[in-house]
Amino acid sequence: MAGLRARRGPAPGLLALSALGFCLMLQVSAKRLPKTPPCPPSCSCTRDTAFCVDSKAVPRNLPSEVISLTLVNAAFSEIHDGAFSHLPLLQFLLLNSNKFTLIGDNAFTGLSHLQYLFIENNDIWTLSKFTFRGLKSLTHLSLANNNLQTLPRDIFRPLDILNDLDLRGNSLNCDCKVKWLVEWLAHTNTTVAPIYCASPPRFQEHKVQDLPLREFDCITTDFVLYQTLSFPAVSAEPFLYSSDLYLALAQPGVSACTILKWDYVERQLRDYDRIPAPSAVHCKPMVVDSQLYVVVAQLFGGSYIYHWDPNTTRFTKLQDIDPQRVRKPNDLEAFRIDGDWYFAVADSSKAGATSLYRWHQNGFYSHQALHPWHRDTDLEFVDGEGKPRLIVSNSSQAPVIYQWSRTQKQFVAQGEVTQVPDAQAVKHFRAGRDSYLCLSRYIGDSKILRWEGTRFSEVQALPSRGSLALQPFLVGGRRYLALGSDFSFTQIYQWDEGRQKFVRFQELAVQAPRAFCYMPAGDAQLLLAPSFKGQTLVYRHVVVDLSA
C-alpha cells in the first residue's frame, strides 16, 4: 500500500511552491536581459543613437529616445517638409556623403532641441529659404563640401544662437544673390571659417568676407504690363487739371477723343468723357489760366478747339480751326514762350502749311505760317539755353530748325539737320551738358545725333525698319528710348553714360505703335503705348533688386 501511494506523485503544496519558484526565476531572467530597441535593417541602434547606411528613406522605426542620428550614403535624393519630425528629442544630426540634391522648406521642423547639424559631402546646389526654420537651439551648422553655388537671402535668420558655421568647399557664385551674405558676414557674431568664390572670373579665389559691397551692381529695372486698354489709339497726352491726372487719347476707330482719369485709389485709368471726333489724329490738352482746352486735330471734317465747362461738367466747342490753313494735321505741339501760350500744327497735306497759333484773351488765333508745301509729319519744341526752337520734319527732306525771334515774335529758320534727309519724327533730350536729337526713319536706321551749336555729329544708328514712333524719356535718373515698328516688337534702349550711347534693354510686345508717352502717376511710373492695330498698353517701370 505504501508503494502504491508513492506512485501518486508529489503533494499539491509542493507543486504550488515549484510553480512559484519557476515564475520568480522567469522574472529575474527578464530583468537581467535588456530589451532590444526597434531599428531598421539599414541602421545600427542603441537606446539613444542610430547610425544608418544605404537607407532608402529617412528611417521611421527608430527608438523614440534617439538624440543622435547619422545618415551615410543614403539612396534617396530629397528631404521634404517634416522629414525628421518623428524624432523630437534629436540633438545631433549628421548627413554625410549622400546624394542629396534638394532639401526643402521646413525639412527640420519639429527638431526644437537640435544643436548640431552637419550636412556635408552632398550634391546640393542650393537650399530653400526656410530650410532651417524652427531650429531655435542650433549652435553648430556645417554645409561644407557640397556643391552650393548660392544661398537664399536670410536663410540663417531663424538660427538665433548659432555659434559656428562652416561653408567651406562649395562652389559659390559671387553675384548679386550672394551680396546679402557678404553683408551678413560683416555683422554676424557667428564664427565662420574663410570661404572663397568659385565664380565669376573677376572674383574667383577671392575671400567672400573681403568682397567690397560697391562691386555688386544689383539694381536693375523692368517694364511690366500694368493695364490693358482694349482699344486702338494713335496719340496719348497726359495732363493735370484741378489737381487730378488725366489722359487724352485720339481714337479714330471709335470717332472720339477719349478722356481717361487716373483713379488714385484703384490705381487704374478709368473712363471719364469723350469728345466727338470722327477722324482724330491728335487730341492736345492745354491748361491756360486754369481753364482746360483740348485741340482736336482731324484728317477730315475740320479741326476744333473744345473747352471744359466745370459748371455743366462737359466739353463744349469753343472754335473752329480754319480748314484752309490746316488741311491734314499729323502732329500737335503746345508750349509757352515769354508767358504766352502757343500750339503748332504739322500739316501733312501737299497744299498745306505747318501753322502756329497763339492764345489771346478768349481764343487761339493764327500767328504764323511755317514751312508750306512740304507734307510735314512731326514737330518738336526745344527750349534750351533760353533759345526756344521748333524742329519740323517730314519724310521727303531734312528736318528744319526754327529759332524764336523775340524781336519779331516769330520763328525764324535757322538751319537743317542734313545728316538725315528723310526723318519721320524728331525728338530731343539732354544728357549731362550735351543735347541730342533722335530721328526715326521708316526705311533705314534711326539716328542719334549730338547737337553741337550749328553742327550735328552722329553718335549711333539703331535698326528701325517700319518705325513711325520713338520717344526718349527719363525715369528716376535712368534715361530710356522707346523705338516702335510696324514690322517687329518695340525695343526699349537704356542710355549708357560711360559709352555715351543707347544699349538694348528690353522688348515690348506692342503692335504698330503710333506714340509713346511717359506718365508719372503718384508712385507709379507708367509708359503708355497707343497702338494703331491692337490694344493700347500701359507698362509700369519697376526697380528690381537682384540681391533680394
Swiss-Prot record:
Signal peptide: 1-30
Name of the molecule in the record: Leucine-rich repeat LGI family member 3
LRR repeats: 89-110, 113-134, 137-158
Glycosylation, residue list: 189, 311, 394
Domain LRRCT, chain residue ranges per copy: 170-220
Domain of life: Eukaryota
The keyword Protease belongs to this UniProt entry's keyword annotation: no
GO biological process terms held by the UniProt record: exocytosis; regulation of exocytosis
Segments annotated as EAR repeats: 222-264, 268-310, 314-361, 363-406, 410-453, 455-497, 501-543
Oligomeric form and interacting partners: Interacts with STX1A.
Function: May participate in the regulation of neuronal exocytosis.
Classification via InterPro entries: Cys-rich_flank_reg_C, EAR, EPTP, Leu-rich_rpt, Leu-rich_rpt_typical-subtyp, LGI_related, LRR_dom_sf, Quinoprot_gluc/sorb_DH_b-prop
Annotated compartments: Secreted; Cytoplasmic vesicle, Secretory vesicle, Synaptic vesicle; Synapse, Synaptosome
Organism this protein belongs to: Macaca fascicularis
Origin organism lineage: Eukaryota, Metazoa, Chordata, Craniata, Vertebrata
